[in-house]
Amino acid sequence: MDVLGVGWDHFTAHELEEYDGVNLLKGGIVHADAINAVSQKYADEICTSEYGWGLERLIGEKRYKLHGILNGIDYDEWSPAEDIYIAQRYDTDSLEGKELCKNDLQREVGLPERNDVPLIGFVGRLVEQKGIEMIAHAIWRLMSWDIQIVMLGTGEKWAEHYFSDIAAKYPDKFRCIIGYRNDLAHKIEAGSDLFLMPSLFEPCGLNQIYSLRYGTLPVVRATGGLDDTIENYHNDGRNGTGFKFYDATSDALLGRSEEHTSELQSRGLI
């Protein structure tokens, strides 16, 4: 407390004390004039025991000053009409360039150049929070479908090795690039038909917003900012900006994936 320059009278269960230690976040929540979470759904979630990490009761008491404000993106960098990394620039009035971007992505990562199959992109950390175990359980069934998947990311070593091994077994269907390249991240957003984000929790998320910008349909688990930013597609074909699933299971991911790939093909979008 002396190091912080804070009096010991603040070391109480109602302010900074937490299990005989100092919890600065707790103190911030107590004394802040306003609290911001990066989406309204996540603001609601952190008031529950599942997402509150022991502070849910305190956050609930301070709910009156908690606000959910979505993150924004850099619309100058993430714009298919201005993107310096993609093979062909395009916009909502002329989507022909997206097909050229798909072919360019396929060449870049070594996939066969095919416009008749759905191409699914993933860019993110290969960690539990991002739903990587769901993808790991689903990948074998996905490899039995006529699809292509491009994964870019780094994270837990088991995941890096696991997906690299699968890519070696299915070179015409799955490519896994370990690491991060900004140019390739742009190419994946522009060249993919679908973008996968099966997060266990996601305070806001940015890639689903990039995907909307690039005309790439997000496939997301309905949590946090993913739920707030994506309107679920309905079979009437008139509403929706992407596809949501709710259970944190590979079966739920696969069910929604099969539905949306079939929908893309039936509507002649690939």
Q: Could you say what each language-model-derived stretch is?
A:
Residues 1-262, 266-267:
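Catalytic cores of nucleotide-sugar-dependent glycosyltransferases that transfer UDP/GDP/TDP-activated
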